[in-house]
Each structure stands twice: as structure tokens, then as C-alpha cells.
Amino acid sequence: PDSIFIYEHKIGNVPTRKGAYSMTGMNYPKSNAGYPRPDYSVNKEFPQVSEQWLVRSGYEIFSSPAYWDKKVYVGDDSGAISCYSATDGRKQWSFKSDMRIIGTPAADKNVVVFGSADMNIYGLNASNGRLLWKINTEAPVLGAVTIQNGIAYIGGSDHKFRAIDIKSGTVVWSYDGVEGYIETKPLVYDNLVIFGAWDKNLYALDKKTGKEVWKWHEGKPGRFYSAAAVWPVAANGKVFIADPERALTAIDASTGKTVWRTKESMVRETVGLSEDKRRIYSKTMNDSVVCYSATTDFPEKIWASNVGFGYEHAPSMPVEKEGVVFGSTKNGLMFGLDAHTGKVLWKHKVGNSLISTLVPLSKNKCLFTATGGEIGLLVIDYKINKHK
């Protein structure tokens, strides 16, 4: 109780202790002057927002929740994936893998699929957590999962990307041309499955065969500029990404050629698509969210909104639901914007750790997870709005 211990936890390895610091020594002024503390006053400005329920898992959470059939599925740093009631947050069941879970799971047809750093991909019964199948790979599996028409798409760190039948656990196809590891949530668009990796490349594969259709890379060399953390979106024949080079890019979905690319707004690793597929959204690295047209062949900015979240680099995607753009930040702040104007509708702070991509159930309800271990359901009553 009187010390802080520092550990290094490399993926796939046991945590290693690096140091310890006593909490009994006075290493700061007693007045605390000049040392700002976490501020939750924003919640008083927006009383229409509240937490219907909040659960503290006790472990760090690095992924978004998955939602299916009124249930919430969350993987954590202990290697456990747990199922909660979306109504009240009560835990229904928990299944333990051997190492941490980094990627966002997906659930459909009573099967929940996820990857683990223990080098396996799992399929569980979504109702009771019973193991249905397990696929062993050759490296930690950190990628998020997308399920479409009974097929799960997921990338690993073994230079492979797989399509898996979720009922049988059979690998439908495997693409072994990936040069780096994968963390993103794959996009299924028309006949393609699209994903980035930490190897500079954005890949497009035939979703039925796994054959490479095209591979995109533009900009500075080096894997640290890869469009690997962003979850790609697509509409009107174009794929949209944002990368660490602070560029927002539209790519021809058929050819893999760049349609337009702009650094005007200094966005980074976030992109979202409007429900009518006419607009895209992205967070900038300082305070703002921007909106661009998804229909033009040039970068047309529609609006920019000063949300006031400060310096920002969390790869948490903006998501539109029923005319509201839901977003989150590295400092525990969530917000809602008018999708057509960018007007700030609400903000709410639940902690001081990174909030992963939100999962709105409607414009009034939103699931969230935080790196600090929190899982919850946010409720917004738009009839109550005292904010001026």
C-alpha cells in the first residue's frame, strides 16, 4: 500500500519488474500548486448524460466491447473474455485464455470469436461461454474480428490473415503475404476484405478466396507510418483511412489507387462513416473533429468542430448512430456531435484512461470500455439540456 511497482509486459511474455517507488517520501510541494488534478466538472455542464451501469473488471482493457442479443462481450489483460447483461451489467459468464486479449471480439449466430496473445483464435458459445473450437497460430493474435455471413475475418502476428467459418471453426482460407502484425478491425466491402498492418501496407483481398487484389502504400517509408491502427471504412467506391502521417486518404476500392490525400486537418488514425454514407469523420490531434465528403473525388471539408479535448492521439473511431457522432479520447472523455453540423451535443468523463471505440446502441445509449478496466452503458436524455 506504500509503493508503486513498475513492470514491463511484452506481448507473449511474462511481466518483468523494472522498479519500485516509495509513496512515503514527499517528492512534491505540500500545496500541490502547479500540479493539475483530473477534472470532472464537464459532467455538471451536461446533466443529460449518466451511466446506467458501470463495472470495474480489475484488469486493463485494450479493446472495444462487442454487442449481440442484449449481451456485451469484453476481453481483458488477464486473458479473460467476459459476457455481461447489456441491461444492468451483471456478469453472465467468463472464459479464460492463457494470455492477454488485445483485439476487439465479435459475436453473431450465438458464436463469439476472439484472438489471444496465447497464439490461439477462439470460438465460444455466446450464451454460456463454452468452447466450440480453437485454432492455433504461430504468434500472438492481436487483431480485432469482423463477422459477415457466418465468416469471421481476423489477422494475426504470424504474417497470416484468416477467414474462419464461425460454426465449425474451419479455416476457409488463409493469406500468408502479410509482412507485419495486425491489430485493426477488418473492413468487408463488396467482394473485398480490407485491413492494414504494421508493415506500411493496406491490403485488399478477395473475401471468398483470400487472393490479393491490391496492396496500397503511400507516404513516408517505415512501418511507424502504417495505416495499421485505423479501422478502414468505405462508400461510393472508395476506401477511407487516416494514418500516423496525419493524412486523410481516399483510395479507389477497385484498383487500390489514391483518389485524394490531404494533411489539411492533421488527423491521426481515426475515421468513421456516416449512416447515409455521404460523409466521413476523423479526430484531429488537437481539440477538433472534422467532417469530409465521402462522395467527391477531392478532399471537401464540410465542417470542423472544436470539442475541446486537447492533445489527442487515441485510435478510437468516431461512429455515427441516428444522427449523432459518438467519439472518445485518451483522457476518459466521451462526446456526441450533431452529424450534419458538428455541434457539440454532450460530453461525459468517466475516468482518466483511454476510451476505446464506442458502440452506440441508439442515439440515447452507448457501450464503452476504458483502459483502466471500466465497462459501462452511457445513457443520454436529449430532453434534458441545461448546457448553454
Q: For each predicted feature, which ranges?
A:
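Extracytoplasmic beta-rich repeat domains
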Residues: 12-66, 78, 92-108, 131-148, ...
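Short loop/turn segments that connect beta-strands within beta-propeller blades
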Residues: 10, 85-88, 125-128, 165-169, ...
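Short, low-complexity, Pro/Ser/Thr/Gly-rich segments in the mature regions of secreted, periplasmic
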Residues: 376-387
